[in-house]
A protein has these predicted regions:
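N-terminal export signals
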Residues: 1-17
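Short helix-capping/linker segments at secondary-structure and domain boundaries
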Residues: 6, 45-48, 148-150, 325-335
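Short, glycine-/small- and polar/acidic-enriched structural segments
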Residues: 18-169, 177-180, 184-197, 201-214, ...
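Soluble non-cytosolic domains of exported or imported proteins
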Residues: 32, 61-64, 130-134, 172, ...
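Pocket-lining segment of extracytoplasmic ligand-binding domains
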Residues: 82-84, 171-280
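Conserved C-terminal helix/tail region of periplasmic/extracytoplasmic solute-binding proteins
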Residues: 316-380
Length: 380
């Protein structure tokens, strides 16, 4: 979506904002565990506890649908792939900012059962959820480290032995594509890796959080006009999301049930046991992943998915640097002129999450050291 292509949607956004200056919280989400804090906040009445109204979250099918619904103003609070926020603000000129991280980790590279090594993906196709995704960044790093090159070709096109064809698919389409051998792997958010395991159509080759420690996958993205014109409302939105993250960390099995098709709100089509495998895995599963090599950095003590809201600037800076060296289809010329430090300052508005953290005990409440700086650890 170019800046010109976004204009009609932005016109709709402006019209909606003018017509409804006190709009309630309208969440747009995909049926993935990335959405957990937003859905928990809605289910547990945390927005209402802050004194604001929230409509039932809107389930969308693809990342393209999520960003289009957001740009046009149909929804006003979304979880969005962190690289997509860079593309939206600087490539499509969308007036919106990151206000918090929604979760960390929570993604993996799943491959066909007969694939035992990343190098065996040479000459085959692997699906990604979106060109601007941490999945694409991490996958291409893994491919390079294994002597492979990412390419973008038509499905079925001839590939060299060291080429891996990247295809974009909605997350829900990935397990069927893997089962039918249309692709030989995919890298995506949970629970679609756990789903492949349950269906016995794939195995987890590597967790992304074991490549980039505590990386953000999805972040909370909000319209700039809400942040500027409704700062108190915006603060309450972020308060609710931060409290939802804390609740989820302490009620993982309950969260899996809440999000599942067995839950009262049926937020996702997933079974509780599939979501439980992600949110509340057993110790025996951790040992199995250590043995298989899906987890190589045991000392990182990464959870399959975890939650903490602070958007560390070092992550945004490193993400921008890596996006410049990542194969991305479409008009990506805007990336060349981006300054990582300036983007970290301009793309993110952390005043709301800092206040929200202060009210719940700071970063220590999430098991982190106080202070809003860290160093990025990336080790494929």
């Amino acid at each position: 979506l170019s800046a010109a292509g976004a204009l009609p949607l932005l016109s709709s956004l402006q019209a909606r904002a003018a017509a409804e200056p006190d709009a309630p919280v309208r969440i747009g989400y995909l049926p993935i565990t990335d959405a957990t804090p937003l859905l928990v906040a809605h289910a547990n009445g945390l927005f209402e506890a802050e004194g604001i109204q929230a409509e039932r979250p809107v389930l969308l099918r693809s990342w393209a649908q999520v960003i289009e619904a957001f740009i046009s103003g149909q929804v006003n609070v979304i979880h969005l792939l962190s690289p997509m926020t860079v593309w939206a603000r600087y490539g499509s000129k969308v007036p919106a900012k990151v206000v918090a991280w929604n979760h960390v980790g929570g993604s993996g590279l799943t491959v066909a059962p007969e694939i035992a090594d990343v190098r065996q993906l040479g000459g085959k196709s692997v699906a990604i959820p979106f060109w601007y995704s941490i999945h694409n960044v991490v996958l291409q790093q893994l491919l390079r480290d294994n002597g492979l090159r990412a390419v973008s070709r038509a499905v079925g096109a001839a590939l060299a032995a060291d080429e891996v064809n990247l295809v974009v698919l909605p997350p829900s389409d990935m397990p069927p594509a893997l089962a039918s051998k249309r692709i030989h792997g995919y890298i995506v958010a949970e629970p679609f890796n756990a789903l492949a395991e349950n269906l016995k159509v794939g195995r987890v080759q590597r967790f992304t959080g074991d490549v980039w420690r505590n990386h953000a996958c999805c972040v909370v993205f909000m319209h700039e006009h809400d942040l500027e014109r409704r700062p108190q409302w915006s603060q309450k939105v972020v308060n609710a999301i931060v409290k939802a993250q804390l609740w989820t960390r302490e009620h993982r099995a309950e969260a899996a049930q809440l999000l599942s098709k067995a839950g009262a709100n049926r937020y996702t089509p997933h079974a509780p046991e599939v979501l439980g495998r992600v949110l509340a895995p057993g110790a025996e599963e951790q040992q199995a992943y250590l043995a298989s090599g899906a987890i190589r950095h045991a000392d990182w003590q990464e959870r399959r998915i975890d939650f903490q809201p602070y958007p560390y600037p070092s992550y945004t800076e490193e993400l921008v640097r890596r996006l410049k060296d990542t194969l991305i289809e479409g008009n990506n010329a805007f990336l060349a002129s981006l300054d990582p430090r300036q983007v970290a300052s301009d793309l993110v508005d952390d005043r709301f999450v800092r206040q929200a953290l202060a009210e719940v005990g700071g970063l220590q409440a999430f098991g982190l050291a106080e202070g809003f700086q860290r160093s990025e650890e990336i080790s494929p």
